[in-house]
Amino acid sequence: MEDNEENKEKKTTLEDLPGVGEATAEKLRENGYDDIMAIAVASPKDLSDVTGIGEGAAAKIIAAARKFADIGNFETGEEILERRKTIQKLTTGSKNLDDLLGGGLETQAITEFFGEFGSGKTQIMHQLAVNCTMPKEKGGFDSDVMMIDTENTFRPERIIQMAKSKGLDPDETLKRIHVARAYNSHHQILLAEKAQETAKEFNIRLLIVDSLTAHFRSEYVGRGSLAERQQLLNKHMHDLLRFGTIYNAVIAVTNQVSARPDVFFGDPMAPIGGNIVGHTATFRVYLRKSKGGKRIARLIDSPYLPEGETVIQISEEGVNDGT
């Protein structure tokens, strides 16, 4: 047993994994796979694509990395509970919404906010970006933020407003928010893949994608392209989830809705992305407009929290309870 522990301590580089020589290790590092955990949560196809080795060989490398990282095996419920103690929660700025989400947005999970135009999705993303830079005692992570902006909706002026209302230095807050504009779905996927490079230079604990599905929706039109769209969207979401797992980060995404023509009673609106997004997002929050600056937030999916809804307010100061 002691020998196994010693071997684990020694095996700290990619070259220590069986089947990984200098050339393969270099290709892996160039593509963001530069530690054992990154290899352990990868798929054989991903490693095969970036290194040129066969999927069988890639699977063996991943299996060895998982053994070293001590993941991928059966665990007791007690062990999982202990591991979940590493999970942290980021405040939304609204106590009502925090309570609905069990204390805020969880790390190592994807939280999706979906709704019609003007429902407050982008406002919440801006607020989360500001909140992430706040001290831990105020519900933040005192860390940097990465945002993939697909619709050119990021506004530094809004960040300044929100930062001032929180008593933060707006210039310092802006310096800690790293924004990349995604011009199409493939560029969006590439930015998510390369996010790890930025995370190594800065302490990134929040990754935002606003909006998750806009490019996929506009580029893949018709039933003939649906399978390809869903395949790419699936890969993209798993890249995001992997980032959250490796860096113990919050993943927050926005999503658009469309009307279902077959629904005659009740709310006909449904989020874009179908089962792929529905099954991969850990928490799903439906936002609807109400009177004035009020919004109704409904939690419709969670692994352990009950469905429910609450009222929040979006004002000049940001996202709050309006009291």
Curated annotation (Swiss-Prot):
Keyword DNA damage belongs to the record: yes
Alphabetized UniProt keyword annotations: ATP-binding, DNA damage, DNA recombination, DNA-binding, Nucleotide-binding
- Domain of life from the UniProt record: Archaea
Cross-referenced InterPro entries: AAA+_ATPase, DNA_recomb/repair_Rad51_C, DNA_recomb/repair_RadA, DNA_recomb/repair_RecA-like, DNA_repair_Rad51/TF_NusA_a-hlx, Hlx-hairpin-Hlx_DNA-bd_motif, P-loop_NTPase, RecA_ATP-bd
Give the residues annotated as coiled coil: none
Q: Does the keyword ATP-binding apply?
A: yes
Quick one: which residues bind ATP? 115-122
Free-text function comment from the UniProt entry:
Involved in DNA repair and in homologous recombination. Binds and assemble on single-stranded DNA to form a nucleoprotein filament. Hydrolyzes ATP in a ssDNA-dependent manner and promotes DNA strand exchange between homologous DNA molecules.
What protein name is recorded for this chain? DNA repair and recombination protein RadA
What does the record give as the organism's lineage?
Archaea, Methanobacteriati, Thermoplasmatota, Thermoplasmata, Thermoplasmatales
Gene that this sequence comes from: radA
